Amino acid sequence: MNFFSNNFGTPCNVEFELDNCQNRKTIEVTQDKGKTEKLFVFIGNEPVSGKVSINIKEKTKKIEHTGIRVEFVGQIELFYDRGNHYEFTSLVRELAPAGELTENKTFSYDFSNVEKQYESYNGTNVRLRYFVRLTIGRSFASNIVKEYDIWVINFVKPPESNSNIKMEVGIEDCLHIEFEYNKSKYHLKDVIIGKIYFLLVRIKIKYMEIALIKRESTGSGPNVFNESETLTKFEIMDGAPVRGESIPVRLFLSVFDLTPTYRSVHNKFSVKYFLNLALVDEDDKKYFKQQEITLWRRGVTKPGLPGSTNNNNNNNTSNTNNTNTPQQKVTESQNEVPEPENNSSDESD
């Protein structure tokens, strides 16, 4: 059992306890100002239940209240719109009617059928979080409020169709290349395999590189904010190619902290991933082509994680990049997050 407490500078301390958390996986979340905390991982529609204890600091004093309630909340915060939080899930349980607390009290709570349709996400301009909130209402003083976060991931089934990506691009009478990737949809521990084939080369190429780019879009309409991050970039060719030359591409996704692709989450934000192929000529002129790929979360059976299956269910979690941008990051501690082992690029376990 795990206890989390907070000293409010108020007449009581509040402690949360989750049921069945002894073997539950955790994820380490880095919040603002470098503060990190470990959150328990919940999958899909797993129930969220436990106990909350209210401990009075001074036994000789009582706490008058207008009612005690506990809520389970799913919330989206847009950092450019601070102060406005968008709740997409909210369930309330009344724990006690108006009265007095004269001694320590422990209440049980159970949110058995709560839908957690989206994954938790900490991004550059947006955060999606799930939390349990206790509120002790008071008439002549501010309410006592304590929130306790959990981390949610969702598994999805493998895509029914997953065709390869093949496209011919270039500059008329100067450069024509054909690039091909083995799939258009990849699970988070997959391997991207492809090749670049030169059909026509009449300019002097110095080198070619490929990059994996994450693009976070927040807002809607004219108020859309796009934030792009280069997760990795490396050179795949050095020197001038000749007609008929083929350059192999191999990119292991398991070494990066990725989320699945998110599309229009509650009409508030999206997260997409792109492969960016760039060629640079001897005049340092850059030619590039960007191709979107879809990422999804694959599920596996692992002991000690309630709710995990081997039915290849999957959908998205942590967000980190290998650049030093000042943002909220999620890092996966070793052996802590339920993800497939990196021993195959196949989509089935």
Curated annotation (Swiss-Prot):
**Alphabetically ordered keywords of this record:** Membrane, Protein transport, Transport
Q: Name one Pfam family in it.
A: Vps26
Segments traversing the membrane:
none
The primary site where this protein sits is membrane
Cellular component, GO annotation: cytosol; endosome; pathogen-containing vacuole; retromer complex
| Localisation | Membrane
Amino acid composition bias (Low complexity), ranges on this chain: 308-325
Chain spans, region Disordered: 299-349
Q: Please, which domain of life does this record's source organism belong to?
A: Eukaryota
Cite the record's Polar residues compositional bias ranges.
326-343
Q: Which GO terms describe its biological process?
A: intracellular protein transport; protein retention in Golgi apparatus; retrograde transport, endosome to Golgi
Membrane topology type, per the record? Peripheral membrane protein
Q: How does it assemble?
A: Component of a retromer subcomplex consisting of vps29, vps26 and vps35.
Q: What does this protein do?
A: Plays a role in vesicular protein sorting. Component of the membrane-associated retromer complex which is essential in endosome-to-Golgi retrograde transport. The vps29-vps26-vps35 subcomplex may be involved in cargo selection.
Q: Family, per the entry?
A: Belongs to the VPS26 family.
The name of this protein is Vacuolar protein sorting-associated protein 26
Q: What species is given as this protein's source?
A: Dictyostelium discoideum (Social amoeba)
